[in-house]
UniProtKB/Swiss-Prot annotation:
The lineage of its organism: Bacteria, Pseudomonadati, Chlorobiota, Chlorobiia, Chlorobiales. One of the primary rRNA binding proteins, it binds directly to 16S rRNA central domain where it helps coordinate assembly of the platform of the 30S subunit. GO terms for biological process: translation. Keywords: Ribonucleoprotein, Ribosomal protein, RNA-binding, rRNA-binding. Disulfide bonds: none annotated. GO terms for cellular component: ribonucleoprotein complex; ribosome. NCBIfam families: PRK00136.1 (NF001109). It comes from the Bacteria. One of its GO terms (molecular function) is structural constituent of ribosome. Part of the 30S ribosomal subunit. Contacts proteins S5 and S12. Signal peptide: none annotated. InterPro entries: Ribosomal_uS8, Ribosomal_uS8_CS, Ribosomal_uS8_sf. This is Small ribosomal subunit protein uS8.
Length: 131
């Protein structure tokens, strides 16, 4: 059965792998998911990612990050904009949880955090929030 919301599938795979204490998880490839993975590495929520092109289909292998006491680096990750209800924010974007968490947006300048979008003066679709 095809996945209707590939971003929600990506987030669910990360969440489930973190709860199961897996070191890595494999996610079907898309350019948008690769850009999200790159942003999560920059912000320190995942350790690393690798794009693997196999014979059948390409996928992204994500290395998960855990704290010294074994807790998953991502405390909460929630999809905001869904296929049935799109959520957009303008350039006057407010901080998520007073700056403690991040909103990840899809903008005309690529995948950005809420802080980067405010600095560049752009708005866009709010993909998900992370804490």
């Amino acid at each position: 059965m095809p996945v209707t919301d590939s971003i929600a599938d990506y987030l669910t795979r990360l969440r489930n792998a973190g709860q199961a204490k897996n070191k890595t998880t494999d996610i079907p490839y898309s350019t948008q998911k690769e850009n999200i993975s790159k942003l999560l590495v920059e912000k320190g929520y995942i350790k690393n990612y690798t794009v693997i092109t196999s014979d059948r289909f390409p996928f992204i292998r994500v290395e998960l990050k855990y704290g010294s006491n074994g807790t998953f680096a991502i405390k909460e990750i929630t999809r905001v904009s869904k296929p049935g209800r799109r959520v957009y924010e303008g350039k006057d974007l407010r901080k998520y949880l007073g700056g403690l968490g991040l909103l990840i947006l899809s903008t005309s300048k690529g995948i950005l955090t809420d802080k980067e979008a405010r600095e560049q003066g752009v708005g866009g679709e709010v993909l998900f929030r992370i804490l």
